[in-house]
From Swiss-Prot:
<comment type="similarity">
    <text>Belongs to the eIF-3 subunit E family.</text>
</comment>
<dbReference type="Pfam" id="PF09440">
    <property type="entry name" value="eIF3_N"/>
</dbReference>
<dbReference type="GO" id="GO:0071540">
    <property type="term" value="C:eukaryotic translation initiation factor 3 complex, eIF3e"/>
</dbReference>
<dbReference type="GO" id="GO:0005634">
    <property type="term" value="C:nucleus"/>
</dbReference>
<dbReference type="GO" id="GO:0005852">
    <property type="term" value="C:eukaryotic translation initiation factor 3 complex"/>
</dbReference>
<dbReference type="InterPro" id="IPR000717">
    <property type="entry name" value="PCI_dom"/>
</dbReference>
<comment type="subunit">
    <text>Component of the eukaryotic translation initiation factor 3 (eIF-3) complex.</text>
</comment>
<keyword id="KW-0648">Protein biosynthesis</keyword>
<dbReference type="GO" id="GO:0001732">
    <property type="term" value="P:formation of cytoplasmic translation initiation complex"/>
</dbReference>
<dbReference type="Pfam" id="PF01399">
    <property type="entry name" value="PCI"/>
</dbReference>
<keyword id="KW-0963">Cytoplasm</keyword>
<dbReference type="GO" id="GO:0006413">
    <property type="term" value="P:translational initiation"/>
</dbReference>
<dbReference type="GO" id="GO:0016282">
    <property type="term" value="C:eukaryotic 43S preinitiation complex"/>
</dbReference>
<dbReference type="GO" id="GO:0003743">
    <property type="term" value="F:translation initiation factor activity"/>
</dbReference>
<dbReference type="InterPro" id="IPR016650">
    <property type="entry name" value="eIF3e"/>
</dbReference>
<feature type="domain" description="PCI">
    <location>
        <begin position="249"/>
        <end position="417"/>
    </location>
</feature>
<comment type="function">
    <text>Component of the eukaryotic translation initiation factor 3 (eIF-3) complex, which is involved in protein synthesis of a specialized repertoire of mRNAs and, together with other initiation factors, stimulates binding of mRNA and methionyl-tRNAi to the 40S ribosome. The eIF-3 complex specifically targets and initiates translation of a subset of mRNAs involved in cell proliferation.</text>
</comment>
Length: 443
């Protein structure tokens, strides 16, 4: 079971109990896991020395197989209390240096060619023809092309992500090896994420998605595994690049990907829920946002026995149980969890504000006159702050409501329709659909 608590109990509320690093890590590249560990280390208190050592050991275990030799040596010294690292680290450093020199020489010719306009202008979309041209005119071999890939991998392992990205790009332009091209695309996506080049990351992410949809169409298990990884990698641009929000929400709600989330990684529901709720007011299409919100509510309900946290419980309490008191309690806990999550910290205030809008909207649907005192409790604000918040809401959204200061109430100028009126409206809709179906059958 993915959650730490299957029910809405408030006894298990420490943010650490909802830390998802151990869930996320198996689906991330080791270089992507490192900033998550750094984030957790930065949140520790001075007296949490045991936890600090655990994270330090985790960093070392994570990176010791990479070629970031100097940094790994420093981690080892810190872990073992040494002033100087063992000689083996100097030997490894020298070995990596020689490998870099070797690949530099092996790729020098093809790199120089790809920087010449007269060569680039003769390249076409046909990779086979390009290789034939380069082989005939410039004595380029397949081994030279593959050396670009190997050099890119080495640079990535050294933590030189920008250089690795460029090498993998050059390789992809020339290679006809579909498997390696696919790996290179994943590699470039990782590089663009780690260098926070979000626009390029989104381009690579789209290429990876297309590869999954086409190359793995006849391998459902491989598709599931690759989609699971892509969803996890996509969290980086999703919460760091505003322009990624809508295309990535479209991706997550795609049938293949939402099924992947539900079947293989239900904890992603936390991030999907936050992304949708904080997208209110930003979404270009209000209808799409409303549908996504309905889908989130449906999935939260379906997955309640697989995954829960204060964020999903807030949605369950407000939109399924209509329990405003429980929703407010879960919102308080949700804010703590958001502030302890690497991806969500920067969105905590936005989520709380958007959640209060949801509470207010839901409350207004069933009340024509609302006590300010009662509403402030629902919103988790004191009376003065609640009053200011509502005034700003009325002003910014042109909500048809006013505050009756004498009575201490918010008066909605569009009271909810009666049950009788709702029945009439639904009957009209049903009658119209019946007419359409009848006409279709008649044709």
């Amino acid at each position: 079971m993915a959650s730490t608590s299957p029910a809405t109990t408030n006894g298990d509320v420490a943010p650490a109990n909802y830390d998802l690093v151990l869930k996320l890590a198996p689906h991330l590249d080791r270089h992507m896991i490192f900033p998550l560990l750094e984030f957790n280390a930065g949140r520790l208190k001075e007296d949490e020395t045991d936890k600090a050592r655990e994270i330090l050991a985790a960093k070392y275990a994570l990176l010791k197989k990479t070629n970031m030799t100097d940094y790994v040596a420093n981690l080892y010294c810190e872990l073992e209390g040494l002033k100087e690292p063992p000689a083996e680290y100097a030997e490894r450093r020298q070995k990596v240096f020689h490998q870099l020199e070797k690949y530099e020489q092996e790729t020098a010719k093809i790199t120089e060619l790809l920087q010449r306009d007269d060569v680039v202008n003769n390249l076409r979309s046909d990779k086979v023809a390009n290789l034939e041209f380069l082989k005939k005119e410039h004595d380029v071999t397949i081994d030279m092309v593959n050396a670009l890939y190997d050099f890119g991998q080495l640079q990535y392992s050294c933590g030189n992500y920008a250089d690795a990205s460029e090498l993998l790009y050059r390789f992809r332009v020339l290679s006809t090896d579909n498997d390696k091209v696919s790996y290179a695309t994943w590699g470039r996506l990782a590089c663009e994420i780690l260098t926070m080049n979000w626009e390029s990351a989104m381009e690579e992410l789209q290429k990876v998605r297309e590869s999954i949809d086409t190359r793995l169409a006849n391998n459902p298990l491989a598709q599931l595994q690759h989609r699971t990884e892509l969803v996890h990698w996509a969290l980086f641009p999703l919460f760091n690049y505003d322009k990624a929000r809508e295309p990535l929400l479209d991706l997550f709600f795609n049938a293949g990907f939402i099924n992947t989330i539900q079947a293989n990684s239900p904890w992603i529901l936390r991030y999907l829920t936050v992304a949708v709720i904080t997208n209110r007011g930003r979404a270009k299409n209000a209808g799409v946002h409303q549908k996504q919100m309905k889908d989130v509510v449906r999935i939260v309900k379906q997955e309640a026995y697989e995954y829960q946290d204060p964020i999903t419980r807030f949605v369950h309490a407000l939109c399924i149980d209509f329990d405003f008191e429980e929703a407010q309690q879960q919102l308080v806990l949700a804010e703590e969890v958001l502030r302890s999550d690497f991806f969500l910290l920067a969105h905590a205030d936005d989520f709380v504000d958007s959640a209060r809008h949801l509470i207010f909207e839901s409350y207004c649907k069933i009340h024509a006159r609302i006590s300010l005192k009662d509403l402030s409790a629902r919103l988790g604000l004191n009376n003065d702050d609640a009053e200011k918040w509502i005034v700003n809401l009325i002003r910014d959204t042109r909500l048809d409501a006013k505050i009756d200061y004498k009575e201490g109430t918010v008066v909605m100028n569009h009271p909810p329709s009666s049950v009788y009126q709702q029945v009439i409206e639904r009957t009209k809709g049903g009658f119209f659909r019946t007419q359409v179906l009848t006409a279709a059958v008649a044709r």
